């Protein structure tokens, strides 16, 4: 970040090269898009589970929660290929007060883990619908499954991709 590089470009038909200086910056990928439907439904679109997804979603939910007419939420996980397990756990926890979110089973017993929700449903118990399709994979399936298993959300859509797994590299 902050470092620069100079690129010299010689265009066809021109005799003089042009020099461009490019400075590196942090690029934050936005994986959360939100809107209010009819001023009463919070629509949360999650396109991936990257390292900033939970922070972005938390910020957007707190903005939407200020609306006094809000009656429920739609969490759209369609065509979300997944991403980081840690983000799937944090995002699931936003909508749960307790219960198991997911467990992982490794080749060695010490790699087996269980992840549980902490108290504090960020949407205060409002109804939640989760949209899924065959493009919902991996972390998307973990979130959808956890919310369904805990009877916290209704899933609507198609059968998911069927990955529902975690790889550690």
Model-predicted segments: where are they?
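Cleft-lining beta-strand/loop regions that shape enzyme active-site pockets
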Residues: 1-169
């Amino acid at each position: 970040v902050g470092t620069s590089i100079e690129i010299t470009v010689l265009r066809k038909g021109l005799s003089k090269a042009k020099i461009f200086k490019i400075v590196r910056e942090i690029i934050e990928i936005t994986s959360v898009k939100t809107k209010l439907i009819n001023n009463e439904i919070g629509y949360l679109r999650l396109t991936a589970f990257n390292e900033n997804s939970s922070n972005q979603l938390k910020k957007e939910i707190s903005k939407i929660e200020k609306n006094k007419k809000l009656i429920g939420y739609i969490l759209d996980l369609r065509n979300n290929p997944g991403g980081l397990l840690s983000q799937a756990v944090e995002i699931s926890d936003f909508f749960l007060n307790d219960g198991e979110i997911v467990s992982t089973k490794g080749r060695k017993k010490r790699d087996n883990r269980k992840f549980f929700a902490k108290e504090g449903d960020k949407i205060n118990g409002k109804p939640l619908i989760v949209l899924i399709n065959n493009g919902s994979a991996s972390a998307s399936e973990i979130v959808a499954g956890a919310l369904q298993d805990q009877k916290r959300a209704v899933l609507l859509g198609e059968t998911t991709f069927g990955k529902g797994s975690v790889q550690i590299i």
